[in-house]
Amino acid sequence: MKVASGSTATAAAGPSCALKAGKTASGAGEVVRCLSEQSVAISRCAGGAGARLPALLDEQQVNVLLYDMNGCYSRLKELVPTLPQNRKVSKVEILQHVIDYIRDLQLELNSESEVGTPGGRGLPVRAPLSTLNGEISALTAEAACVPADDRILCR
């Protein structure tokens, strides 16, 4: 997906399209884009199956919109774990999996809120990091007593 720098993209897209900096799991900044003015213009375009795009959109602008949409579908394929990775999937199938995944997440959230805490459903309660760090340091101290040849078995 094409990503422009923050200052030029805001100026080019106009005041109605804001850029928001988000954080990915790896910590790298990623630009999250809102709908561009062109896509808003397309969505407002009234008409049925024979409707034409507004005159303000030339072929290059339409190609840019399609490229951005393909990038969005690629991102969805990465984010949704239920999509099959070993074969090519259609855009409709991607959307169906996204909808199902969101529904599953909502059901999971609702079931947690009804029961209370995750530990109340039979799931183990997570230990605090201080407890885990203490256990790790105790294991490290014990490992110092073990001969170096036997330590490899503990990994």
UniProtKB/Swiss-Prot annotation:
UniProt xrefs under SUPFAM superfamilies: HLH, helix-loop-helix DNA-binding domain
Gene3D superfamilies reported in the protein's UniProt record: Helix-loop-helix DNA-binding domain
Keyword Cell membrane: no
Residue interval(s) of motif Nuclear export signal: 98-111
GO molecular function: protein dimerization activity; transcription corepressor activity; transcription regulator inhibitor activity
Pfam families: HLH
Keywords annotated in UniProt: Biological rhythms, Cytoplasm, Developmental protein, Nucleus, Repressor, Transcription, Transcription regulation
GO biological process, one term: negative regulation of DNA-binding transcription factor activity
Keyword Ribosomal protein among record annotations: no
InterPro entries assigned: bHLH_dom, DNA-bd_prot-inh, HLH_DNA-bd_sf
Main localisation: cytoplasm
Localization: Cytoplasm; Nucleus
Protein origin, superkingdom: Eukaryota
SMART domains linked: HLH (SM00353)
Annotated bHLH domain residues: 53-105
GO cellular component: cytoplasm; nucleoplasm; nucleus
Subunit structure: Heterodimer with other HLH proteins. Interacts with COPS5, IFI204, GATA4 and NKX2-5. Interacts with CLOCK and BMAL1.
Cited function: Transcriptional regulator (lacking a basic DNA binding domain) which negatively regulates the basic helix-loop-helix (bHLH) transcription factors by forming heterodimers and inhibiting their DNA binding and transcriptional activity. Implicated in regulating a variety of cellular processes, including cellular growth, senescence, differentiation, apoptosis, angiogenesis, and neoplastic transformation. Inhibits skeletal muscle and cardiac myocyte differentiation. Regulates the circadian clock by repressing the transcriptional activator activity of the CLOCK-BMAL1 heterodimer.
Protein name as catalogued: DNA-binding protein inhibitor ID-1
Annotated organism of origin: Homo sapiens (Human)
Classification lineage: Eukaryota, Metazoa, Chordata, Craniata, Vertebrata
